[in-house]
Regions:
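ATP-dependent carboxylate/acyl-activation modules
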Residues: 1-239
Length: 239
């Protein structure tokens, strides 16, 4: 509803570059759920987390200072509980070799299969603030299929109609719409997530320096969406 009231200022005690878990917690406060995950600090904790989330999991470096984890050896996928302990030790060594820093924390995440991958971000330029929306994952790297939704200057909310129209402008829209016998993606849940992300951008205003989810997993119709990776940088200032 374009006549919805402007979002109230939101207290955001964190500032600086948030780690992935903190960024997802921030996004979840506004209505964008994340994948199931557990933060760990040791191989033994990682094994226990993998047993809870398995049968196969993702292991990631957890750091607010290193945002591009894969470039320093900080991501491993498709691990079993038996594999994750040794893999964590190797990851810690790789990160230290690449960065000179000691890796102190890691995330163990559930594996999500059969989902479309979307990128969702905040884009700022002289015209104002916009929501960046497009296909994520490998598709994003290959064809850069994105569109921008400019947020209203008067603080009015985006509408579901605007978001769905933007999705339909993507060249890869058919991948969400049952292309060649694929399951139709949960587009209503994706629209809700985009609206929630926009509310966050409006509520935090200029304090939100950067925010991105890539990928946001869009599961088959009725199964919702999950943020799998997240970046957020919060500036200092009044909340």
């Amino acid at each position: 509803d374009s006549t919805a009231p402007s979002p109230a200022p939101v207290s955001c005690p964190e500032h600086g570059s948030l780690d992935e878990a903190q960024a997802k917690a921030l996004f979840a406060r506004f209505g964008v759920p994340g994948v199931r995950e557990i933060a760990v600090r040791s191989p033994a904790e990682a094994v226990e987390a993998a047993r809870q989330l398995g049968p196969r999991v993702v292991l990631k470096l957890l750091s607010g200072d290193i945002l591009h984890k894969s470039e320093v050896g900080g991501v491993a996928v498709n691990l079993t509980p038996d594999e994750i302990g040794p893999r964590l030790r190797r990851m810690a060594a790789d990160v230290q070799r690449h960065t000179g820093r000691v890796a102190e924390a890691f995330l163990v995440q559930e594996m999500v299969a059969g989902a479309a991958e979307v990128i969702l971000g905040v884009h700022r330029d002289p015209l104002g603030t916009a929501i960046l929306l497009g296909m994520g994952g490998v598709v994003a790297e290959l064809i850069r299929d994105t569109t921008l939704l400019l947020l209203p200057e008067d603080g009015a909310a985006l509408t579901a109609w605007q978001v769905e129209a933007a999705l339909r402008r993507l060249k890869t829209w058919p991948l969400l719409d049952g292309y060649r016998g694929r399951d139709r993606a949960d587009v209503p849940a994706l629209v809700d997530a985009v609206l929630a992300f926009a509310r966050m951008a409006q509520a935090l205003g200029d304090r939100l320096v950067e925010a991105e989810i890539n990928p946001l997993f869009v599961r088959p119709l009725g199964q919702g969406v999950r943020a799998a990776d997240a970046i957020a940088i919060i500036g200092a200032g009044a909340a």
